[in-house]
Every structure is written in structure tokens, then in C-alpha cells.
């Protein structure tokens, strides 16, 4: 199913998925883990594209240090403001992801906290 999410929602979803999958204290069944990994794979290109744009903007508005690492100096508020404006445009833009929505019975009563369930909410459907 195709669903539209803002890039910032995709980033948040990726964080929740990664946290659930990597947390040894959360015991989820193998099928749910498989489904969550598949969803992560489906949004991977959007995460990578965001990182590319963000890094390009850091290089554009920032300066490199002696190690060749770019950063935007707080001494240059104009550059930081332009960077934030550019990144906000990307974060607020919509992307389409094609996934099979999670069914409520796949995630409820599976040991996931309410915080995790809230993070998964955009991809839980009937």
C-alpha cells in the first residue's frame, strides 16, 4: 500500500524501528521482526537521500576544521539560519512509501511499549 509521510515522520519511524529491532530487552516474535526489517528496507532510500542533502548543505554553509570535518559555526548565525530553513523544507516535504501496513494484532500484545506503538502508529492499519 502506498502511503504519504513527511520526511521528518519517516526519520522518526526509522528511529523507532531501529530501536525496537536493536533492543535486546524487547522480545518480539520472529515474524514481527521480519516485518519491521522489511519496512526499514522500504524507507531506507528516503533516509539516505535526506542524509546526502543534509551533508551537502553542511558543506555548503559550513567550514572544515583541521581534520577536514565540516560544521556550521554558531559564530555565523546567518549560515545556520539558512541551513535550518533549507533542511526544514526537506523535513516538511512528503514522500511516498510502499509497504504492507502492520495489522493491529501483529503489534498489540507483543511486548511493545506504548511509546513504540505511538511511533509505529502511521504504519498500523486494518
Regions found by a protein language model. Give the residues of each.
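A composition-driven surface/loop motif
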Residues: 1-126
Amino acid at each position: 500500500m502506498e502511503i504519504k509521510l513527511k520526511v521528518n515522520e519517516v526519520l522518526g519511524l526509522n528511529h523507532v524501528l531501529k530501536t525496537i529491532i536493536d533492543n535486546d530487552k524487547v522480545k518480539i516474535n520472529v515474524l514481527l521482526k521480519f516485518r519491521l526489517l522489511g519496512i526499514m528496507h522500504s524507507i531506507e532510500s528516503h533516509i539516505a537521500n535526506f542524509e546526502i542533502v543534509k551533508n551537502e548543505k553542511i558543506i555548503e554553509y559550513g567550514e572544515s576544521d583541521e581534520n577536514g570535518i565540516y560544521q556550521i559555526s554558531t559564530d555565523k548565525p546567518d549560515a545556520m539560519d539558512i541551513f535550518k530553513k533549507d533542511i526544514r523544507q526537506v523535513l516538511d516535504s512528503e514522500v511516498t512509501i510502499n509497504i504492507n501496513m502492520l495489522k493491529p494484532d501483529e503489534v498489540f500484545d507483543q511486548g511493545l511499549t506504548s511509546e513504540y506503538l505511538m511511533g509505529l502508529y502511521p504504519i498500523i492499519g486494518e
